[in-house]
Amino acid sequence: NIGINNNRTAKDWGTDAGVVANDFSWPKIIEYYAQGEEEKAFVGLGHILHLSEDMTVPEHTRNDPHIGDPITGNSPYEKWVGENKNRNTLKDVYYSVGSPLNFNNISEYFDFLAKYTNSNFFSKDSIESSVYTKPVIVDYDDYYAYGIDALNNEKFKILFAKRDKKTGVMEKFIDTKDDHIIMSSYFSRLSPLAIRAEAGIIDLFFKEGKIARDKYLAEQKALQEKTAQKNQSLADSLSKKGRFSLFLSGLGFLTNDYI
């Protein structure tokens, strides 16, 4: 987990309380939920889920900026998903999702997704990289390069590959104008994992939220009981004094304030 150009990572934004004034970090949204501010908690949870989704986009995990300008360009993967996937076309994903991912804390979700995406998929500008040693191309045919999915050990299409007839150099690229099979190959693996992670994060949110809420309510109850006891003790003390004694007590406090 490293940020673009060594800036803050998505995990930092999602887990580090106090990074920004409008705090929707994990500790803060658990606190919101515990204190009954559910609207803020659920808005914050949406932010966390969005950040976790980013960990299943190769550019986000391979230090590959893609802001759509002439220098960085777009993310081919995000562009293809945005143009080709919607509620109707996602039906097949539903049946291939599997059970939620279960980790002990929110950081583990970010680490797992980022490591898997980084190690198994290329981004457009990191195919020939001196920084990343993975993914590893294990085979070629006339049109494609193949990698091995670390989760299930399956061989899958990972890049387009074409040998230049003049130079003999193997040209590798991630997408073409007319053939998007690599994007589809990536999506079929990354999207179910994103959904499984989100389901696990939601489950973790309610588990931690319940623990935090029970603790908060117990603390509030103890505070109320302590305050009630203090008020009752004061009332009992005052009821035992006559009016003249109360006057003298008040006069004493007033005198002390001015001496």
Regions from the PLM with identified roles:
Residues 1-47, 51-54, 58-248:
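N-terminal, motif-rich segments that launch catalysis or mediate targeting to/interaction with membranes
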Residues 123, 249-259:
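Low-complexity, charge- and small-residue-enriched intrinsically disordered regions
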